[in-house]
A protein has these predicted regions:
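Long, low-complexity, polar and repeat-rich extracellular regions
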Residues: 1-225
Length: 225
């Protein structure tokens, strides 16, 4: 499905049921929302996508030149895959409920927000925010879940909470003015925060990194350079 809707506030809702999608497993759903030259206060998109069942695949691209677009994605089942790309000023809520679900998120430019929830085992989330003023927050409940966050440019914030065993959380932030927090409750968890800083520039604020761990056999690494 694709389309241009100049002058309209779009609110599509998409639901994927496992059996019907599994019958065309080789096909990847591509859903794109594009915007014409409508007034700025009307260029707002709201989309809700649900994957239910097993082995579903989703590719979603949301592009807008104005802030305020919102997307909600829910993966409920086993071995679902979602690939999501957003422009600037977007908000995304992601829920992974089940096992072996996989989500790749790319948010560009400025002031993007992501809130995520992982519930189950062996789920994977990869986030790439390429801009400034981005905010990422969320939690994982279960075992062997992984969250990998990469924030570039400046003044981004990320907060991850994991409850369970053998989980992995990684936050990498480039440039200056970042904040990163990882909280892990359980055993054999691994946390890593890496923050960069512009060389020969004393006018920029350095990053702030915090790791909290409770349990046994955990590993924590903070690199600021």
């Amino acid at each position: 499905m694709s389309g241009d809707y100049p002058g309209l506030a779009n609110s599509p809702e998409l639901t994927l049921i496992g059996e019907s999608v599994r019958a065309a497993r080789s096909r990847v759903l591509y859903y794109r929302m594009a915007f014409g030259y409508a007034p700025a206060d009307q260029r707002v998109a709201v989309a809700e996508i649900t994957q239910r069942g097993d082995n579903n695949s989703l590719s979603f691209s949301q592009q807008t030149y104005y802030e305020g677009s919102r997307l909600s994605v829910s993966q409920d089942g086993v071995s679902n895959q979602a690939e999501i790309a957003q422009g600037d000023g977007n908000r995304l809520a992601l829920v992974q409920d089940g096992n072996y679900n996989d989500a790749d998120i790319r948010q560009g430019d400025y002031h993007n927000e992501l809130n995520f929830t992982q519930s189950g085992d062996d789920n994977r989330l990869t986030v790439d925010q390429n801009g400034y003023g981005g905010v990422i927050s969320g939690s994982s409940t279960g075992n062997r879940n992984s969250v990998d966050i990469d924030q570039r440019f400046a003044s981004n914030r990320a907060s991850v909470t994991q409850n369970g065993d053998d989980n992995l959380a990684s936050i990498e932030q480039g440039n200056w003015g970042h904040q990163a927090t990882i909280t892990q409750l359980g055993s054999a968890n691994e946390a890593m925060i890496r923050q960069g800083f512009p060389a020969n520039d004393n006018t920029r604020l350095p990053g702030v990194a915090t790791i909290h761990q409770s349990g046994t056999g955990n590993s924590a690494t903070i690199i600021q350079q």
